[in-house]
Amino acid sequence: MKNTLDSIALTMLRPALSPLQLMQLCRQAGDATALVDNYDRLEEVLPSPSDKLKTVFQSMPDALDRAKMELDFCEKHQIQVLIPTDTAYPQRLKNCEDAPLVLYYRGNADLNSARIINIIGTRRCTFYGQEIIKNFIKDIKSASPDTLIVSGLAYGIDICAHRNALANGMKTVGVLAHGLDMIYPSMHRETAKEMLSCGGLLTEYPQLTRPDKRNFVQRNRIVAGMSDASILVESASHGGGLITCGISTGYGRDVYAFPGPVTSPASAGCNNLIRAKGASLIT
């Protein structure tokens, strides 16, 4: 429990320290507790800590107070706090160098299911994209019914993927860009509630964290990292789904994309990615 509390405290030092920096520091020191217990004498657990780093760590007492409040909130709302040493922590994600030091999770899905795919794409999906998801998830259900479907609970492709997974009795997890004290967008609240008993909600952000734009980009690495493969359904030429595909490639994961009409802006990103051999074609 102490290492969990200390891990939460370290994340309270963001944005001064990035997730990658936090993981690197923990590896160097041994674990989160070593850093927290020696926050005012970092040279005892780290090789040549900079003055800037020492200054950041001077706020550790306040970070610990906030971490205790967060842990109380999680206990009150049945939220699991997962750190990399926990068996329930997504092991695929754990192998990524910039994995989150802490994850907050509500749900009943196994985050280490034998098969996990993410389904991603534009927020402005077309009827074509919706039909692709509908048929694709039916096919996945027939071939591998225990596959866990991951997406981001956003408008468009994301929510369509979640709802079709639920409709087919498949578990689905939404990775959020904010704390578990809210649902964004609010109109997806009922779907999110249903997912708690047939999948779950996952985030690296504590309560009171708002869905800022930068958080969505950070969220994408979790979507990519916890999955075996990324499935891009529709994307504009510079769509956010392409970011997730790029991260997946960097992690050594498979990337697939559905081709679309050459006249459709919603398929331009998919077609370009396939043409550049950045994704395997799904037909």
Where are these regions (language model features)?
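Glycine-biased, small-residue-rich flexible motifs in mid-sequence functional cores and linkers
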Residues: 1-4, 83-283
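Short, small/acidic-rich helices and loops at N termini and domain boundaries
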Residues: 1-87, 273
